[in-house]
């Protein structure tokens, strides 16, 4: 019963974590504007990344980052560089219409890679899985509990972000976002650059 209660608590914490806006939310909604399919694939990729982070947390991410300082620094710099690059790319292509020959909806593989990379370099993920999440997982829990934790991380994240992709690509919402594509991409790109800059400035 103790393990079941812990799983329920972890599920609640996971739901609060994915619901808070951040790079993951920005990338899935902006991708869904270009293509519903690509947006949903991005959502599943974010879910896969959550499962990866859960596995890393179970393996002792918090202890590693705490005792080997350069690993945390390297993760922060890599994440910041990727977010800045992605943000700059979005701003540069913000005014390109989606039906232009030079710009097409991302392929499934491209959407999956982008979603996974954004989540794996997301500072929120490092902080969440390296601290709160890792602390909530009992040290000597059985194997089935660890499997359940990873499954919950994948399920909660996939459900939320795929839901956001479907919402953003709903005809009414999609038309509104398409009319504001240049503004949306510029704002999201700018926010990603700001997030990356804050990561670089952090100590």
Protein language model regions, located:
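Hydrophobic/aromatic residues within the transmembrane alpha-helices of Major Facilitator Superfamily
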Residues: 15, 19, 51-52, 88, ...
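Flexible cytoplasmic inter-helical loops of multi-pass small-molecule transporters
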Residues: 92-110
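Juxtamembrane transmembrane-helix termini in multi-pass membrane transport proteins
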Residues: 2-73, 131-148, 152-153
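Hydrophobic alpha-helical transmembrane segments in multi-pass integral membrane proteins
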Residues: 55-58, 121-130, 188-203
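Alpha-helical membrane-protein architecture signal
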Residues: 8, 12, 105, 109-117, ...
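Selective transmembrane alpha-helices of multi-pass membrane proteins
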Residues: 67-96, 156-164, 175-203
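Select subsegments of transmembrane alpha-helices in polytopic membrane proteins
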Residues: 45-52, 112-125, 184-188
